[in-house]
Regions:
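Internal alpha-helical scaffold of NAD(P)-dependent oxidoreductase catalytic cores
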Residues: 104, 108-114, 130-167, 180-217
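NAD(P)-dependent Rossmann-like dehydrogenase/reductase catalytic/cofactor-binding core
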Residues: 205-266
């Protein structure tokens, strides 16, 4: 079945996901429709991605077999009120909003719906995202597998209980920002040590990518991999000790906890 895929809202995360979908060999651009708030942004979506775009949410709601709700959380209730009577009965509704629960969405629709709450992250735009998905009780196994096949286009995914979404948001949803800060700090250090800035960024980025890939492909504990780099009395252990002395681990743990707390209180 060639399902029609709709997006209501297309901010940074929506664009990351849309970008992955239009690159997929088995999804036609003719089967994707996007609504945005302004005519200018709709035209930009059409120009950049080659998909049908509109400013009319109801148009997307009527057409979509798979409906991504990609608006900001504080617009969610308003958008659902606008489209709830127009969505197809068998449509799979996919939420990507942080802090908006399955129960809230079901309550706002006020009827039985097929719903999957998800949380992707921005590396989805290059096919290296990490997403969490949580289906409601109306989603069949085949439908969940289909949603999973979409999220495989964005990278990898895990089916999680909704109670674990706060931890996931802190660990994966927001963590690209932490990693980019780390890359920036490493590159700044490289510049301070005399490297050209472009080369410093390239080196830092590849170091992060390679380290993550090494951990994933070897399955070794990161602590073991760290120890393998540290020679007795060498340069690496000197840097590691300085990071420990300055509270590197505790700073990261505290930041992740703060992020999770914010998610719980949204």
């Amino acid at each position: 079945m060639n399902r029609k895929i709709g997006f209501i809202g297309c901010g940074n995360m929506g664009k990351a996901m849309l970008g992955a979908l239009v690159k997929a060999d088995n999804i036609s651009n003719d089967n994707i429709i996007v609504s945005t708030k302004s005519k200018a942004s709709a035209e930009k979506i059409n120009d950049e991605y080659g998909v049908k775009s509109t400013t009319v949410n109801s148009e997307v709601a009527k057409e979509a077999d798979v409906l991504f709700l990609a608006v900001k959380p504080y617009f969610f209730k308003e958008v659902i009120e606008e489209i709830k009577d127009l969505v197809k009965d068998e449509a799979i509704i996919i939420s990507i909003a942080a802090g908006v629960t399955v129960n809230q969405i079901e309550e706002w629709f006020g009827k039985e719906i097929k719903l999957v709450r998800t949380m992707p992250n921005t590396p989805a735009s290059v096919g290296e995202g990490m997403s969490a998905i949580c289906p409601n009780g109306n989603i069949t196994e085949n439908e969940l597998n289909y949603v999973g096949s979409l999220y495989n286009l964005f990278g990898k995914y895990e089916v999680l209980e909704e109670k674990d979404f706060h931890a996931f948001i802190a660990l994966c949803g927001s963590s690209p920002a932490y990693v980019f800060m780390f890359i920036e700090a490493m590159a700044d250090a490289g510049v301070k040590l005399g490297l050209p800035i472009a080369k410093a960024y390239k080196l830092a980025e590849q170091a992060i990518l390679g380290s993550a890939k090494l951990a994933l492909e070897t399955g070794k504990h990161p602590g073991v991999l760290k120890d393998e780099v540290c020679s007795p009395g060498g340069t690496t252990i000197e840097a590691v000790i300085d990071l420990e002395k300055n509270g590197f681990r505790n700073t990261v743990i505290s930041a992740v906890e703060k992020c999770a707390d914010k998610s719980k209180n949204m």
